[in-house]
Amino acid sequence: MSSAKEQSSVTAALQPEQWTTSSNEALKLFVTNPEAALNFQPTFTYPIFGDAETIYGYKDLDIFLCFDHYTFKPFLNIKYSAKLTDDPEIIDIKKTIDEFLPKLTIFKDEVKWVDSIKEEKDNGYKIPGKLIGSFSENDKEYDIYKIDLKSDNGYELHQRLQILVLLFIEAGSFIDAKDELWNLYVLYEKDNKSTSNNESSIVGFTTAYNYWKYPGAKKFDSTEQELRIKISQFIILPIYQGQGLGQLFYSHLFDKWLAQDDIIEVVVEDPNESFDDLRDRADLKRLNTSEQFDFKAVTPKVDKEWVEKTRRAIKLEKRQFARLLEIILLYKLKHGYPGITKRDVRLFIKKRLYDKNKEGLATLDDNTKKDKLQTAYQALEDDYYRILGDLKLNIKRGNDEEETDTVSKKQKV
């Protein structure tokens, strides 16, 4: 027995790659429903297994982390063909993952997991929150719930969901769900099949924080409350991505916040590129139908008072509203709207870029400064055109006629 251990130790020392596994590949995620177990892979595992995202000391390693589609109760199982036992660098995988999972997670015993889910449902498990919105897409129906984090079931649901933040959001971290200023919104796909269980499936979720905003001395003593909503985490499960559901989820939440008088601004905490894209397109579509937004007013000489008044009315933060105005200007330029020149649009966008980076540019000579600004502008212009894609906006032309299909097919400038 000892000789076998010694042999494996020698092999590990000489061929460590045989005992090293990518944690991104080893960890296999599943959402199970009555018909199937839907598999997807994590984007990141470094918050759990370290920056190298590798696990040493196991052969043929598979880590199965499964969730019920309705309650999201987790099940963990770990399988491997061999394990080194005499190396202090070898981690206890279960102990490592347990730190990020709720205490009620079932380990190894799949029958016990299935029975525990059935027991929860037999005891009357319901979505622990309030229905605040619904929509249909691709012949399917979806509900948005604001989860009651003060309730035991609401808090537990968040505990079950939160590991996904680490696995899909770079630099993501857990929130303090006991802080009453946090909100959790969960998107569900309704079960429209002719079955008796009527169980919806979790599609994604977002967390948002309520910030009190100082209203200024004149309003400070008023009883009116002014809040900023900050979207912190936003996840659509990979098995539901590519269907436009994230954009619809965001848009319906934003519409809810628009209707609340105490909310004066909606901001996003450190958005990544994919969420920026989702947000830009959703915001453009909302402006497209908004009675509070006048596309005619958007020119390179746009009135500053109109900008601030409109931005406040539609509750967008300054950076995001500025981006939307720039995208609309490029849209007008692309489609040949009167009075919009490439030079004016370029100078308009460069001014914001300069103001944003004024401190860093101040140390550069004029030629280098111009080169830096032009490079930044060109990258931004390319990105804006990518975001626009084939999007059509209801902008009236000089003759007060809305853009036609012919105009929309003009060659990009």
Question: Where are these predicted regions, by residue range?
Answer:
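Non-catalytic substrate-recognition and accessory regions of acyl/acetyltransferase enzymes
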Residues: 1-229, 255, 260-269, 273-275, ...
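Conserved acetyl-CoA binding element of GNAT-fold acetyltransferases
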Residues: 227-238
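Conserved acetyl-CoA-binding loop-helix of GNAT-fold acetyltransferases
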Residues: 236, 242-255
